[in-house]
Design a protein with these regions (language model features):
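Hydrophobic membrane-insertion alpha-helices, especially the h-region
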Residues: 1-10
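Soluble "head" domains of membrane/secretory-pathway proteins
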Residues: 11, 15, 23-231
Length: 231
């Protein structure tokens, strides 16, 4: 038990994903390993988050643009969220026509074949599917459920020092840094709230299935997602 506590605190921790805000990269029913050492340690790395120190130890191990990270929600530190780092401290972020601009420069935004979403009634629905490439060369895929969604055009967000701007890959179905804290959103995320970096999908079941029902694994497990790296 002590070994398990040490591993979860300092090396990696499993997380289960609910909901669809991170499609197509991460799906509801995915189980992830999150490395706790990637950015050093803060109070939120420890069980029950005791206020033992400020900042991170060691300092200088910083998230990179495009990383998928788990963090504690600033307005409710008991809640774990997972989003992608889009804006670094000092950046100016804006979304125009569904395209992210960083410091006044639109990121590369390429249409790829539609993502096929299976609805509750069993019908397959095509969803607009994009490949986005950040200034550091990091590429990943995003979804666009509707044209001119309410977060497809925003003002300019200036990221404060020591904070990060997060976005979900399912752009029209993600509560993220585009929505401020006073509107029940994420707002800017302090460095010390970041728990770790998402690395591997070690297990995955279809939404509505229960991972502990091992007798259903032949039909409930998404076998093609096991041990998949989080990009």
């Amino acid at each position: 038990m002590l070994l398990s506590l040490v591993v979860r605190t300092f090396i990696f921790q499993p997380f289960n994903i609910n909901g669809g805000g991170e499609k197509p990269t991460i799906l509801g029913g995915d189980y992830l390993t999150v490395t706790k050492y990637s950015y050093g340690y803060s109070d939120f790395s420890l069980p029950f988050s005791p206020p033992l120190f400020s900042g991170r130890i060691p300092s200088g191990w910083l998230p990179q643009r495009g990383d998928y990270v788990v963090f504690r929600l600033p307005r409710d530190p008991s809640a774990d969220y997972i989003k992608r780092v889009i804006g670094m401290p000092g950046d100016r972020i804006q979304v125009i026509g569904g395209v992210v601009s960083i410091n006044g420069v639109p990121v590369k935004h390429e249409r790829v074949p539609d993502f096929v979403e299976t609805e509750e009634n069993g019908h397959n629905a095509p969803v607009k599917h994009w490949k986005e490439t950040l200034p550091n060369g990091k590429s990943y895929e995003t979804l666009d459920l509707v044209d001119n969604g309410y977060l497809d055009n925003t003002g300019v967000y200036t990221v404060p020092a020591g904070r990060y701007f997060m976005m979900g890959d399912n752009r029209d179905n993600s509560t993220d840094s585009r929505v401020p804290e006073n509107r029940q959103g994420v707002g800017f995320v302090p460095l010390e709230n970041i728990v770790g970096k998402a690395q591997i999908i070690f297990f995955s079941v279809y939404e509505g299935e229960r991972a502990w029902q091992f007798w259903r694994w032949p039909v409930s497990v998404r076998w093609n997602r096991l041990l998949k790296s989080v990009q």
